[in-house]
A protein has these predicted regions:
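A short beta-loop-alpha structural element at the N-terminal edge
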Residues: 1, 8-11, 115-130
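Helix-loop element at the rim of GNAT/NAT acetyltransferase active sites that forms part
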Residues: 1-2, 7, 131-146, 158-160
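Actinobacteria-biased recognition of intrinsically disordered, low-complexity terminal regions
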Residues: 1-12, 259-269
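Conserved donor-binding loop and adjoining core beta-sheet/short helix segment
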Residues: 3-62, 67-72, 179-191, 199
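A conserved beta-strand-loop-helix scaffold within acyl/acetyltransferase catalytic domains
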Residues: 29-36, 141-198
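Acyl-donor-binding surface of acyltransferase catalytic domains
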Residues: 45-116, 254-258
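Conserved acetyl-CoA-binding loop-helix of GNAT-fold acetyltransferases
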Residues: 48-61, 198, 204-221, 239-244
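Active-site/acyl-donor-binding loops of N-acyltransferases
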Residues: 82-105, 213, 220-269
């Protein structure tokens, strides 16, 4: 079919656009704005000539760079994104990590004497949110992240997968300052390590390993033998930490960006 046979309609309300040929739906796209002000899009499988007009509709609405991700095994979709004017931004690998301290090497690992570890359930929510924001500035692909207080409360505490034993906060015993956290979420499948981080002045003291030791010990005692996690392939410290724990790679994703004004042919509009 020629491209002009496709008509794009935005669903109301929401950030979903659908492509039609006459009265037949031939494709759809969903957009969402993350707390780091990055617009991500996701396509539903559709007819080949639906993707470009759907993407153009989102670009016209947001006026921003658009981001997309695909599994590195989805070669057809990777090629489609490249053909739509997306360029590869980064690669992220997924890992499976054991929780057994005898395997991870975390047996007996504890936090420094001047650090106290508390559950997120006992933390001040605003301070925890600001710590989360600060740590994400050093996570590839999430710089600029700023949580809305309401969204953070829902994401952190109202979710069914919140586990107070594996969402832990490191506190400077002298100043009371929040200086690090580990967050492992329990889901219907394997638990997932969502974030592990320590603020810059407190790094290289073994605090990240100590937080992981506490969270993984709790999981192991609960009978959860493995945890999933993701790390940017180019972020050597994160990858090295996971591999040192005995992690094995499961697969990965590729993140793409289409810069504002770039068309589906990859040319400047």
């Amino acid at each position: 079919m020629p491209p002009d046979s496709v008509r794009v309609v935005r669903a109301s309300p929401g950030l979903v656009w659908r492509a039609y040929d006459a009265d037949q739906a031939v494709g759809s796209i969903r957009a969402f704005l993350r707390p780091d002000n990055r617009w991500f899009v996701g396509f539903e499988p559709g007819r080949d000539d639906s993707y470009a007009p759907l993407l153009a509709a989102v670009a016209a609405n947001t006026g921003a760079d658009l981001y997309a991700a695909a599994y590195d095994s989805e070669r057809a979709h990777l090629a489609r994104l490249a053909g739509l004017g997306f360029t590869e931004l980064r690669r992220v690998s997924s890992y499976l990590i054991p929780t057994d301290p005898a395997v991870t090497g975390l047996d007996g690992v504890t936090e420094p004497d001047d650090v106290v570890v508390i559950s997120a359930a006992d933390a001040y929510e605003d301070e925890l949110r600001l710590l989360d924001d600060a740590l994400r500035q050093d996570v590839p692909g999430t710089d600029g992240w700023r949580w809305d207080p309401g969204d953070f409360q829902e994401e952190a505490f109202d979710a069914a997968h919140f586990n107070p034993a594996t969402y832990l906060v490191a506190v400077d015993a002298d100043s009371g300052r929040y200086i690090g956290l580990v967050r492992v979420r329990n889901g219907p499948g394997r638990p997932r390590l969502g974030l592990i981080g320590v603020t810059r002045p407190y790094r290289r003291r073994g605090l990240a390993r100590a937080l992981l030791a506490r969270a993984f010990r709790a999981l192991h005692q609960q009978g959860r033998t493995e945890v999933t996690a993701e790390a940017d392939d180019a972020h050597t410290p994160s990858v090295s930490l996971l591999l040192a724990l005995g992690a094995r790679r499961l697969g990965g994703t590729v993140e793409f960006v289409q810069r504002r004004g770039i068309t589906a042919t990859g040319t400047q509009s």
